[in-house]
């Protein structure tokens, strides 16, 4: 599975929250099925995301792309350090952890 294509399909057809603040906020409320974090996400933010995902038992995938590249994958003209998949739409993005 091409992870970049799966992310783009999820953004286009599903319900995805972009950004670390919104992702953490939704994770705290127990929402979301998968968190994708950019490789260069700030250490303190990454620690917060991992802490809250452990509490909510939400899987996390660390993408090898930078935040600028992840933003481009999502079709956005700005960096995206983290995104939370609420609904995958037509994407197979939720299978990403099974292939690692």
Swiss-Prot record:
Entry similarity comment: Belongs to the eukaryotic ribosomal protein eL30 family.
GO BP: translation
Name of the protein: Large ribosomal subunit protein eL30
Record-linked InterPro entries: Ribosomal_eL30, Ribosomal_eL30-like, Ribosomal_eL30-like_sf, Ribosomal_eL30_CS, Ribosomal_eL8/eL30/eS12/Gad45
GO MF annotations, alphabetized: RNA binding; structural constituent of ribosome
HAMAP family: Ribosomal_eL30
Alphabetically ordered keywords of this record: Ribonucleoprotein, Ribosomal protein
GO cellular component: cytosolic large ribosomal subunit
Organism: Methanococcus maripaludis (strain DSM 14266 / JCM 13030 / NBRC 101832 / S2 / LL)
